[in-house]
Amino acid sequence: MKTEAIPINNGRNFPSRGKGLTFMLPRSPLKLLLTLTLTLTLFSPARAEDPKPLKPTPKDKCPVCGMFVAKYPDWLAQVIFKDGSHAHFDGAKDIFKYLFNLKKYNPSKKAEDIQAIYVTDYYDLSPINGREAFFVIGSDIYGPMGRELIPFQKEADARGFMKDHKGKILLKFKEVTPEIIRGLD
């Protein structure tokens, strides 16, 4: 890659700095654009963190099935909207039903309004980012609403679970479809 030294002092020499400050830029406009994009990406402030998951109260109900979710802490799932409102679920299956038919369950919201999605990791029982989770279906483990997507933060844990509990399919968040969810009912 050919580069060219470009002085940033308009070619004037500063007595204390010799020839002034210079840096190397690529000559090609495309390479220059890529260099600038990479630099801006690396040094831009990070986006705002997702809000922390909220604990359900004894009165919080799943908007899909109507169950009181606090009774099932090992299966909790949650959607948090940008305006601070939220919904709790008694498992990953119901959160997907909700997301696939948001107009039915929460007509005032759109997918773009969602700030965070949480599911509960099956092994360590902690809330994890649902969009980054691995889900196992077809296992011998059932959730509060029967057959369930079993969430994991780590792919290795999901694969180990599949071996131990006869799991059939491992999916990422974006691979879950309405047809798969209907097949679990």
Locate the predicted segments by residue:
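Short, low-complexity, Pro/Ser/Thr/Gly-rich segments in the mature regions of secreted, periplasmic
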Residues: 175-184
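Sec/Tat signal peptide C-region and signal peptidase I cleavage site
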Residues: 44-48
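Acidic, Ala/Val/Gly-enriched low-complexity intrinsically disordered segments
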Residues: 4-5
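Bacterial N-terminal signal peptides
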Residues: 31-41
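Bacterial N-terminal signal peptides that target proteins for export
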Residues: 10, 17-33
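Thiol/selenol-based redox catalytic cores and closely related redox-interacting motifs
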Residues: 110-173
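N-terminal secretory signal peptides
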Residues: 50-108
